[in-house]
């Protein structure tokens, strides 16, 4: 079967992009991406292959490489350990992915592949992600990061397939195609909606015009009604 996979975006940027396209429908993908900066994942993270985004939006297909965002917290006292803190994660890790990642990191520590890590704790809460790795003195932080990206889901890919139904058939659309189809859909729906409203208002207008006409010759109408034998004659 076929399934669509469109990354989430910032709503404000999406609206601005639609408005820009309405004003200048000849805009190319690169120009549109000056307004729509790219995907905006709710879990944050780093897009490691930003240079490939124009091609992805031009074709409607591709893979976005996501990396966790890490920060180094230096110990405040000599006895304190430095920490490597994960504050944002790839979108693909939401849900059970965090626990799986913690388990994978623990396995790497146990197998001595992350020998410079002495403790792992998940301090995440409703305020955000916070996974803390306590480090040995003089730990090679860059090496630790590279191992984490290579051996765990802290680096992952999001497959893009901007598939949509157009004219009753599935079609992979690029960014301009999505914008055009969205605006065509809105135009068609709103035209149909306001046509129905217009017809209802025209019916009301005819009734009101009839009442106004009746008021202008009310005496004649009363005389006709009084002189009629029944409702059929009155009509």
Identify the meaning behind each predicted range.
Residues 92-115:
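A short, contiguous, amphipathic alpha-helix enriched in charged residues
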Residues 20, 24, 107-114, 150:
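Conserved helix-loop functional segments at active or binding sites
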Residues 40, 81, 90-94, 114-235:
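Long, charged, helix-rich clamp/arm modules that form nucleic acid-engaging surfaces
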Residues 62-73, 110-119:
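Short amphipathic beta-strand starts and helix->beta connectors
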Residues 52, 66-70, 78, 82-90:
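Conserved catalytic-core segments of large NTP-driven translation/proteostasis enzymes
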Residues 2-65, 96-99:
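Conserved glycine-bearing catalytic or ligand-binding loops at nucleotide- and phosphate-handling centers
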Residues 13-21, 35, 100-104, 143-147, ...:
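Alpha-helical scaffold elements adjacent to nucleotide-binding pockets in ATP/GTP-utilizing enzyme cores
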Residues 60-62, 78, 125-127:
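Solvent-exposed loop and beta-edge segments used for protein-protein assembly and interaction
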């Amino acid at each position: 079967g076929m399934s669509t996979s469109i990354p989430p975006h910032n709503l404000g940027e999406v609206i601005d992009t639609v408005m820009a396209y309405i004003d200048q429908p000849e805009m190319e993908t690169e120009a549109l991406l000056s307004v729509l900066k790219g995907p905006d994942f709710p879990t944050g993270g780093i897009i490691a292959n930003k240079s490939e985004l124009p091609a992805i939006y031009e074709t409607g297909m591709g893979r976005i490489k996501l990396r966790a965002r890490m920060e180094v917290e230096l110990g405040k006292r000599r006895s304190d350990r430095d920490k490597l803190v994960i504050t944002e994660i790839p979108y693909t890790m939401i849900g059970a992915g965090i626990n799986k990642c913690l388990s994978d990191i623990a396995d790497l520590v146990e197998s001595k592949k992350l020998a410079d890590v002495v403790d792992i704790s998940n301090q995440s809460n409703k305020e955000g992600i916070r996974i803390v790795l306590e480090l040995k003195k003089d730990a090679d932080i860059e090496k630790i990061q590279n191992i984490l990206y290579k051996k765990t889901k802290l680096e992952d890919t999001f497959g893009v397939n901007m598939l949509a139904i157009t004219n009753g058939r599935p079609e992979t659309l690029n960014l301009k195609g999505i914008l055009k189809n969205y605006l065509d859909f809105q135009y068609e729906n709103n035209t149909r909606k306001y046509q129905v409203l217009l017809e209802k208002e025209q019916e009301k207008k005819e009734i009101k015009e009839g009442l106004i006409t009746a008021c202008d010759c009310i005496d004649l109408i009363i005389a006709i009604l009084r002189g009629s034998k029944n409702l059929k004659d009155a009509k």
